[in-house]
Amino acid sequence: MAAIHLFDVVARHNQWLSVRQSAIASNIANANTPGYKSLDVQPFEKVLESTRLAMNATNAGHITDGATKAAAVDIRKSEPWETTHSGNSVSLEQELINAGDVNRAYRLNTGIAKAFHRMLLASAKA
């Protein structure tokens, strides 16, 4: 059974949420820019899959598998709900929904981390 590094996953998910929030903010800021295409990030599941088998090299002479580098979050063009005559594909409604999803996911993420932190403290006291 493989160890689950919950706090590492929480930190990686928070980083992914931060990048996604930046992409959403950029989309909202460019809502009236002609020809601007809305952006989004790859799903978090793909980020986890790309770094699943990462090994730690404790010495510079160790051979690594190439997966030890942190996977960069891929920012790509999102599927637009609508495109204006100027070619802009930002939908403010869609971006606000995405921002709400990021907020909800961040609160859930921090709630899980707090619960596990409390469990660790309780087990250390016992």
Give the residues covered by each predicted segment:
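Amphipathic alpha-helical polymerization modules
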Residues: 1-126
